[in-house]
């Protein structure tokens, strides 16, 4: 399995729509950086957030109650305040169409990590298509700003040594084609 370089990421995005919209260079002046890097792509977080609150006493991943989260639009302010020790969901500006022979791993940006903001995203499986739901945790005892439409995490692409027999699309992945923030689902 090989780590893919900027030239491959650029070609796959411009010729095959792997990342859209695609920024061919790293943008980083007066913003948290985003765009193409040497061996990855820095994704941006949109302006819509879902802040988890304590209206209900329990989070159940098998039976998630949407009332456990409050939708917040940060488009006007340009940022979202994540309360101390809080958790929120968001989504990428970029839409992904993963090749069948490629898996992507997403890692939080050091700018946020150094402020106690932890970003988690599960792997982008072969032939996954959709916007990416981003999990954001504030591990500090202080409120923190998360900037809308700026960098939030870096995606690295790993191409398999051989083609997988069954992709995410082939098995009807439950988050295939997701748009916006997608809450937990269980196939029934």
UniProtKB/Swiss-Prot annotation:
Q: Which Gene3D superfamilies match?
A: 2.70.40.10
Name any Gene Ontology BP term.
dUTP biosynthetic process
The pathway where this protein functions is: Pyrimidine metabolism; dUMP biosynthesis; dUMP from dCTP (dUTP route): step 1/2
Query: Which residues are listed for dCTP binding in this entry?
Result: 109-114, 154, 168, 178
Q: Where is the active site?
A: 135
Q: Note the subunit structure.
A: Homotrimer.
Q: What does this protein's UniProt record list under function?
A: Catalyzes the deamination of dCTP to dUTP.
What name appears for this protein in its UniProt entry? dCTP deaminase
Q: Which reaction does it catalyse?
A: dCTP + H2O + H(+) = dUTP + NH4(+)
- Which Pfam family name is an example for this entry? DCD
Q: Does the keyword Hydrolase apply?
A: yes
Q: Name one GO molecular function term.
A: nucleotide binding
Q: Report keywords, A-Z.
A: Hydrolase, Nucleotide metabolism, Nucleotide-binding
Q: Which NCBIfam families match?
A: dCTP_deam
Q: Which InterPro entries match?
A: dCTP_deaminase, dUTPase-like_sf, dUTPase_trimeric
Task: Write down the EC number.
Answer: 3.5.4.13
Family assignment from sequence similarity: Belongs to the dCTP deaminase family.
Does the UniProt entry include the keyword Nucleotide-binding? yes
